[in-house]
Structure formats: structure tokens, C-alpha cells
């Protein structure tokens, strides 16, 4: 490709409404342009990257034995009513009627459509397992689209759905897809982690998120320093401290604390180690518990994990914090003065709290705290459970190393769905015993457009994007200095251009009448991994300057060796 025949569309200035670096660079590099809120046109440079991501995904799906299909973007509302999601999905589901007043939706996902296909096309266990995928535009009416294509309303997604007659078959396909996803993101040279994730409202038995590590990520992910353990912070287990509870050294004391309504105020005013404080959080209880509220206790410097807490039998779902009025009506004190001593409601303490001694907590009297609290002596040890978020330095749940926490961008998610949709849509086959059997399903998604943004978040510097070779818009940029006045420079540039193209290398020849500084800046901005500079002075010594975008160092390569050098260094 020649720049004179191409739409480069680079910008010198960063648009004011672009928040994260990927959004800024995608606009400046001429990859996308905003049409409306959450809607973007992909320009030639951006589309080249998007197609490369898409092709890698498609190749690995084919290698994994998945079968490609294409389903309608517009879906009849009847299917969503049948599955129960018409009322559950919320305002993100774009609903409309056709000229016949028949209701439809613009598909955000395709579980209903694929399940409907299978129930009409597959009748016997002998036809299974089957795994279908598509790469298609989706639409979700996000209330606040932001971060460019990272959270847009319209996006390209690879969604796959597998169907089985046994858990063993589902697990085998799930493992195959896990391996395929790992291969996909490895081929793109992304620093990622496959993390255990909560199944959430979708349900099912297993779930993994594929997270690209980036400081701008929206998710906290946890991984071990010495093993392959990794999990979403909501799911990461906080193991009990190795050392048991120390013996009591202090007497129980009731202290006036009129101006200490938070842990921070208590620590500051009484010079207490925060590790010796406990905070008490009250949430709504289930009817079966026979109580209105449940107390959850975590160490003063730890945070409650609401997903873990919601799984406690006495805790009502969804987890709901008690209001101050409700707390005062039952306890007789405000939220800043709560603690376990003489607390006449169910209590659940975190594992770390169970191992504490001589700690401080509210006295259930406004403006008072107990200091020197010890389990058994002062209050019976209640139910113990893992109800907190892990912190850096915690022991890894597998016993290998300690935990690190980094931000991640979710680019893929795989679920074992079970029979949620097949039961709702009555998708059955004749089993081996001749009786009808409900299918079990797996669901596997990759946000193709989000992968592009995530790759930029992980690969950039002050000059622009640094693409991994596998998804770069071009492999090589040729910058001929003053080619419109130097026949020799033009001849060498054209010869190298044609030779590289013949070898299947994607080349951008900058044949614009521009200053060298502009040419260099544009190629660095759009992130071409390999650049060669051809000038009369270097040609006098039969050399060409080569620069690797990631490493940044310049090398002088013999003109006669430049083709072989590039072929050896380009990773395809």
C-alpha cells in the first residue's frame, strides 16, 4: 500500500473527549471516527487491525472444531419472552416493532437464537456434541458508552455455543475452548491471565474470564507469584492466617469514643494499629433465619466481598445493607458503633477476624467502643467464613507463593451454562435410552473490538501505538527520503516494496511529499513494527537504516541483505 493511495487520517492533537489511552490513540492514529454516542466508523488502518484479530479468532475456532454460522442481528421478541429474558435483561436490550407491530430486539447476544436452531435441527444424541460460533456485530444500549470501543453500544463479538448430553462432554469442550482462547491471546502477544470468575446471573458450574493486564482496566484480578493460580477478585479465596490466634494480653475495656464513627477516626484518635480493629456491617437476613439482620465482621483494613457474603445461608439475596434507621431500631446504636459483644443477631466473621485477639470494635452503644476484645472469653466465636476481598501479599489459595493484584480488561469469557436455556426453550434430543433428554450448554465469547483497544492499552508509548506483529496494520513501513528528487532512492524503495509484497509482507510505502519528521511521526503513531529509512547518504555505503518500533534502536543493514533481515525479524 502507498500512502498516496491510502487514507492515513492521523491527528496531531488528542481529542478532548477521549479519556483512556486506547481511545486517544485510535482517534489520533486514524483508526476510528465517532458517528454518535457509542457508535464508531472503522477507518482503513483500524479495520486492518480488526480483521487480523478476527482472522486469528476464526482460525483457532476452526482448529478447536467449532462450526461457523451466521445468525440474524434482529431477533423476534417471542424467543426472549420464552427464555424469560424479555423482562430480565433491562434497558440495554434495544426493542422495536416492525410495520406489522410485531416486537423484535436488536441482538446483544444469541443464546435464544442458537437454542431455537438446535431444537429444530438436532433430534438425536448421535448428532452431538456440536459447537457453533459466529463473528458478528452486536448492540447493547449502554446507558453511558465510554472509553471509545472499549465500552461502545455497537461492537464486533465472537460468540460460540456448544450442546451436549452429559457434563463430561461439556467439560471436554470447555477445556478445548479454554486452550483455544489461550492460543488466541498468545498469538496476539498479549500479557493476559485466565481467571476464575463468578457465574453471576447466567448460572452454571464453571466460568473463566480472559483478562489483558492494563492499568486502565476496570477489573481487579488476582494471581500467584509462583503458580498459575488466577481469579477475579470477587472469587479469589482469602485463606485463613497460618498463625493461630494469639493469647489474650489485654483486659476488656469500654472506652468513650464520641468522635470516632469510622475505623480511620478510631485509629487516628487512639493511635491503634488498624490490624487490631474490626468493622461490623449489617445486611438484610433471609426469612428462614428468623432475624431481620445479619452482622458481617471484617478487619478494619479489609473490604467485604459482597459476592462471597451473599452465599452465606442467613444473608438475603441480593445482598442489601441495612439503613441507619433499621440498625437503630434493632440494635439501638448507629452504624459507627457496632461490634460483636452483646450483639443479639446472627454474626458471621471473616477468617482473619476469627484469628484476632485484643482487638477493638463498637460496643453497640453510640459513642463507645470495646478495646481488648477476645473470642471465647468476651464473646463466643460465631460462624466463620471467607467474606473479604484478598489483598496483595495474602497467601495464594494453592499454597504456592503470595497474591498480586493488577487491573485487567476482560476480552473473553467462557461459561458452563448447564440447562438454563435448553430447559426454557425445551431443547431436547432422544437419548441413548430412547427417552427425551434436555441438552446442556456452554457459552464462549470474545469481544473482538475490545481486543483491539486492550492491545493498545498494553502496547504504547509517548509516540503512539506499538503493535505486536501479528495484529499490526502493516508489517513494514518504507520511508524513502526525498524520493521525488532522487531517482536512486525511489528505485531502491520501489524494488524493496515489490519484493516484500511478493513475499506476502504487508508494506506501507510512504510516497508523500512530506518532511521526514512528519513521516517518522505518523509511522510511530500508527505503530508499524518495522521501519526502514532509505536515503542517498546511506546508499553511498550500500546501507539502509532499520528501526524496530518496540525496541527503538536503529541498525544499519546492507541493502543486499535487507529483505532476508526483515523476513527473519517479522513475526507472522
Curated annotation (Swiss-Prot):
Reaction catalysis annotation: tRNA(Pro) + L-proline + ATP = L-prolyl-tRNA(Pro) + AMP + diphosphate
GO biological process: prolyl-tRNA aminoacylation
Pfam families: HGTP_anticodon (PF03129), tRNA-synt_2b (PF00587), tRNA_edit (PF04073)
Its EC number(s): 6.1.1.15
Subcellular location: Cytoplasm
InterPro entries according to UniProt: aa-tRNA-synt_IIb, aa-tRNA-synth_II, aa-tRNA-synth_II/BPL/LPL, Anticodon-bd, Anticodon-bd_dom_sf, Pro-tRNA-ligase_IIa, Pro-tRNA-synth_IIa_bac-type, Pro-tRNA-Synthase_IIa_type1
GO MF entry, a single one: aminoacyl-tRNA deacylase activity
Domain of life according to the entry: Bacteria
Keyword Aminoacyl-tRNA synthetase: yes
GO cellular component: cytosol
Enzyme class at the top of the EC tree: ligase
SUPFAM superfamilies recorded: Class II aaRS ABD-related, Class II aaRS and biotin synthetases, YbaK/ProRS associated domain
Keywords: Aminoacyl-tRNA synthetase, ATP-binding, Cytoplasm, Ligase, Nucleotide-binding, Protein biosynthesis
UniProt keyword Cytoplasm, yes or no: yes
Family named by the database record: Belongs to the class-II aminoacyl-tRNA synthetase family. ProS type 1 subfamily.
Protein's job: Catalyzes the attachment of proline to tRNA(Pro) in a two-step reaction: proline is first activated by ATP to form Pro-AMP and then transferred to the acceptor end of tRNA(Pro). As ProRS can inadvertently accommodate and process non-cognate amino acids such as alanine and cysteine, to avoid such errors it has two additional distinct editing activities against alanine. One activity is designated as 'pretransfer' editing and involves the tRNA(Pro)-independent hydrolysis of activated Ala-AMP.
Comment block on domains: Consists of three domains: the N-terminal catalytic domain, the editing domain and the C-terminal anticodon-binding domain.
Quaternary structure, from the entry: Homodimer.
NCBIfam families with a match to the protein in the record: PRK09194.1, proS_fam_II
Protein name, entry field: Proline--tRNA ligase
Organism the protein comes from: Pectobacterium atrosepticum (strain SCRI 1043 / ATCC BAA-672) (Erwinia carotovora subsp. atroseptica)
Gene: proS
